[in-house]
């Protein structure tokens, strides 16, 4: 039986590829977790923006309804 003279090199290369793919997968998992955190914070900002916008509309409505709305300075 003839042995493959490149077998050891191929095994080493495959081992390095597998190790690098595992590192890449871990990095992608970490990135996904951070993106989830960013999305949660952005959602909170979006809600706060909607609250401020609704408050502004309410104030404008009440100023118009009471006749107290004045032009900007």
Curated annotation (Swiss-Prot):
Keyword Cytoplasm carried by entry: yes
Keywords from the UniProt entry: Cell cycle, Cell division, Centromere, Chromosome, Chromosome partition, Coiled coil, Cytoplasm, Cytoskeleton, Kinetochore, Microtubule, Mitosis, Nucleus
Listed GO CC annotations: cytoplasm; DASH complex; microtubule; mitotic spindle
Coiled coil: 14-54
Record-level GO BP terms: attachment of spindle microtubules to kinetochore; cell division; mitotic sister chromatid biorientation; positive regulation of attachment of spindle microtubules to kinetochore; positive regulation of microtubule polymerization; protein transport along microtubule to mitotic spindle pole body
Highest taxon in the source lineage: Eukaryota
Disulfide bonds: none
Function: Component of the DASH complex that connects microtubules with kinetochores and couples microtubule depolymerisation to chromosome movement; it is involved in retrieving kinetochores to the spindle poles before their re-orientation on the spindle in early mitosis and allows microtubule depolymerization to pull chromosomes apart and resist detachment during anaphase.
Record family assignment: Belongs to the DASH complex DAD4 family.
Subunit: Component of the DASH complex consisting of ASK1, DAD1, DAD2, DAD3, DAD4, DAM1, DUO1, HSK3, SPC19 and SPC34, with a stoichiometry of one copy of each subunit per complex. Multiple DASH complexes oligomerize to form a ring that encircles spindle microtubules and organizes the rod-like NDC80 complexes of the outer kinetochore. DASH complex oligomerization strengthens microtubule attachments. On cytoplasmic microtubules, DASH complexes appear to form patches instead of rings.
Protein name per UniProt: DASH complex subunit DAD4
Native source species: Candida glabrata (strain ATCC 2001 / BCRC 20586 / JCM 3761 / NBRC 0622 / NRRL Y-65 / CBS 138)
């Amino acid at each position: 039986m003839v042995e493959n003279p490149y077998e050891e090199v191929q095994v080493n290369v495959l081992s390095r590829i597998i190790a690098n793919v595992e590192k890449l997968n871990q990095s992608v998992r970490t990135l996904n977790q951070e993106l989830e955190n960013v999305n949660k914070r952005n959602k909170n900002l979006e809600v706060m923006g909607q609250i401020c916008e609704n408050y502004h509309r309410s104030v404008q409505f009440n100023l118009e309804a009471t006749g107290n709305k004045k032009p900007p300075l």
